[in-house]
A protein has these predicted regions:
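N-terminal, cleavable Sec-dependent signal peptides of secreted/periplasmic/extracellular proteins
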Residues: 1-186
Length: 186
């Protein structure tokens, strides 16, 4: 965007000094730096395995997002928990889906794009997943581009007290209690 600022010769500062001459300043601003973020409330999210696994990305001046979806075991999660999630990747054998998605938006305007973790927009099977997003438009900033997805058909309500805990397990679709479920606390 081009800007022109014109200053008159009689502009005074707080002490009464005036510019004494007219001045024209011209400048141009560049395009906004490319940016991409997964539009999520936190690093970890819970997802209903009965519903499509969809989230959104906010983007500006980015034409493509590259995505990888890894399926993790509970053991992977516990081992990874002590590492840096932003620099370590799961093993290639854990990769369940890799794809690219075109992004369209006017120049310098923040826009939002849906991202379906399951091809075709369906639900993911229950499990733990790591979604990793990247783009060739970005430099080294990958903050906000990884998301741990815990997908389940069961809702757990946890009540804790001084020397114990109690949990209720209900089916997310029917709302009915889930009988015989083995629950492990870490």
């Amino acid at each position: 965007t081009d800007y022109v600022v014109k200053l008159g010769p009689n502009i005074a500062d707080p002490y009464g000094s005036v510019t004494g001459q007219a001045l024209t300043v011209r400048f141009r601003t560049g395009d906004q730096a490319p940016d991409l973020r997964l539009h999520i409330p936190d690093f970890v999210g819970t997802y209903n395995a009965y519903a499509p696994a969809r989230l959104y990305a906010s983007h500006v001046n980015v034409k493509r997002v590259d995505l990888k979806l890894y399926r993790l075991t509970p053991e992977d999660l516990l081992q990874q928990n002590s590492r840096d999630w932003y620099t370590n990747a799961p093993p290639a054998s854990a990769l369940v889906r890799q794809w690219s998605q075109a992004l369209e938006a006017p120049l310098n305007k923040v826009s939002y794009a849906p991202i379906d973790a399951q091809e075709g927009g369906g639900p993911l099977a229950p499990g733990i997943y790591l979604l990793v997003a990247s783009s060739p438009s970005l430099k080294d900033n990958n903050y906000g581009l990884r998301h741990l997805m815990v997908v389940s058909k069961i809702n757990l309500t946890l009540k804790t007290f001084q020397d114990g805990a109690l949990t209720w397990a209900t089916d997310l679709q029917s709302g009915q209690p889930v009988a015989g479920l083995s629950v492990t606390f870490y």
